[in-house]
Amino acid sequence: MKIYVDADACPVKDVIIFEATNVEIPVTLVTSFSHYSNAEQPKGVETIYVDSGADAADYRIMQLAKKEDLIVTQDYGLASLALAKGCIVLHHKGYKYTNDNIEQLLQTRYLSAMVRKSGKRTKGPKPFTAEDKEKFRALFKSMIAH
């Protein structure tokens, strides 16, 4: 198993790096050049930089990921593609994307886009909380323990 992180806006990178390096599972952070950092990463953690295009990180992750790799993303489109490839896919708020829930998530995203396109407003996501982080940590640890 390898872990790939859609890292541009991922608030749980620290959890992923800490927990994965403890069990020696390699982590690849995929992020745009606009988030470039000279910060040194622990052993077993690699950062891949991609162009700042809308889906550049998603495409790179899909090139790299193999069946049974673990991907962390908040992007439903990437999650859908990764599930089809046989990957395990987690959201940073602590839930697992599945073939049972991805269709509903994509449908909700589409309907919200249509509402916005018509000039109306939609509610954004709720703020990320410490409880969300701990929920993610518990789920992540259970996924990498296998």
Swiss-Prot record:
Extract the signal peptide range.
Answer: none
What is the scientific name of the source organism? Bacillus cereus (strain G9842)
Pfam families documented for this protein? DUF188
The family note in this entry says: Belongs to the UPF0178 family.
User: What is the name listed in the Swiss-Prot or TrEMBL entry for this protein?
Assistant: UPF0178 protein BCG9842_B2187
Q: Which PANTHER family match?
A: UPF0178 PROTEIN YAII
- The source's domain of life comes to Bacteria
Entry's HAMAP family?
UPF0178
